[in-house]
């Protein structure tokens, strides 16, 4: 029997090669979202609620991403927003959102992104995964954020380094809203309490770009409830490699319950305020006890 301590450690992945594949896949998919977008684009289906929409372009773009990534790395797992999880044998999983900001895309608002990341661990388990490389690409503007573990974060090749944050009352704060009406009531209550405490609040409609804007200095801090691994994986690494932190509240990892991102001192203050407001608590009931 071999002593575990004498076994060779698993080889570290080639971060540069993985990052190049992230960017290649995101850019290829981005071309399709712009060039093949129908003029009469409509909702193909809904998911969690009538406002949680999927277009045919979401499906087409995810299929393309799966084809590109599985051809290049057949041993790796795949997890996409629209078509679910395929496990692999390598310990790496590609996590992607073909169109993050689908409602913006549906309305032809040019703030959406293709998000592609590769992670170690199990992205189906909260706190059970860690990104290795990622790319967030806005196909309309061409803005491309990239990050690799230990090699930094970049916007269009320019290294990103976050500076000292302002106090909370001078912080331009980003957020997003969910799809269930009860969740939205909770979020509205939290925003109503926070708005007098911050410089202002922005709701841009694309979580991956929101997070990258924090890394770029266009937002000071960001919080949102309801995000999944495909929303987070690439942009989380961009924030971390730029010198920021991404966490949950109440000692929890960043996950569906809550994500807070920015420079550590500001994140700690905002996270404490969100915890005080029970921002990750039960959704608000409908007036009069009616069901959503």
Question: Where would I find each of the regions flagged by the language model?
Answer:
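Residue-level signal for inorganic ion chemistry
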Residues: 33-36, 58, 69, 102, ...
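An extended, acidic
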Residues: 161-292
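N-terminal subdomain of lithium-sensitive/metallo-dependent phosphomonoesterases centered on the IMPase/IPPase/PAP
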Residues: 1-99, 286-292
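Short acidic/glycine-enriched loop/turn segments that link adjacent beta-strands
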Residues: 50, 141, 253-256
């Amino acid at each position: 029997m071999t002593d575990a301590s004498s076994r060779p450690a698993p080889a570290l992945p080639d971060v540069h090669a993985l990052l190049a594949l992230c960017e290649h896949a995101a850019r290829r998919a981005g071309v399709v979202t712009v060039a093949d977008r129908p003029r009469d684009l409509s909702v193909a289906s809904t998911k969690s609620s009538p406002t949680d929409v999927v277009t045919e372009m979401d499906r087409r773009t995810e299929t393309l991403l799966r084809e590109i990534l599985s051809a290049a790395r057949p041993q790796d797992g795949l997890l996409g927003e629209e078509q679910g999880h395929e496990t692999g044998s390598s310990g790496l999983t590609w996590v992607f959102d073909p169109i993050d900001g689908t409602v913006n895309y549906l309305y032809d608002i040019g703030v959406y992104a293709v998000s592609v990341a590769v992670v170690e661990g199990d992205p189906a388990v909260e706190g059970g995964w860690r990104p290795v490389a990622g790319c967030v690409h806005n196909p309309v503007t061409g803005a491309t954020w990239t990050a690799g573990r230990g090699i930094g974060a970049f916007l269009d090749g320019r290294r990103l380094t976050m500076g000292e944050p302002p106090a909370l009352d001078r912080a331009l704060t980003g957020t997003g809203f969910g799809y269930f009406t009860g969740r939205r009531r909770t979020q509205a209550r939290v925003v109503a309490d926070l708005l007098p405490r911050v410089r202002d609040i922005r709701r841009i409609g694309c979580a991956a770009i929101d997070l990258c804007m924090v890394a770029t200095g266009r937002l000071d801090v960001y919080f949102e409830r309801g995000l999944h691994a495909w929303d987070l994986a690439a942009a989380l690494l961009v924030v971390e490699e730029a010198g920021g932190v991404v966490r949950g509240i109440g000692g929890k990892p960043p996950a569906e319950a809550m994500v807070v991102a920015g420079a550590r001192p500001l994140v700690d203050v905002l996270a404490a305020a969100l915890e005080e407001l029970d921002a990750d608590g039960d959704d608000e009931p409908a007036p009069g006890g009616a069901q959503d």
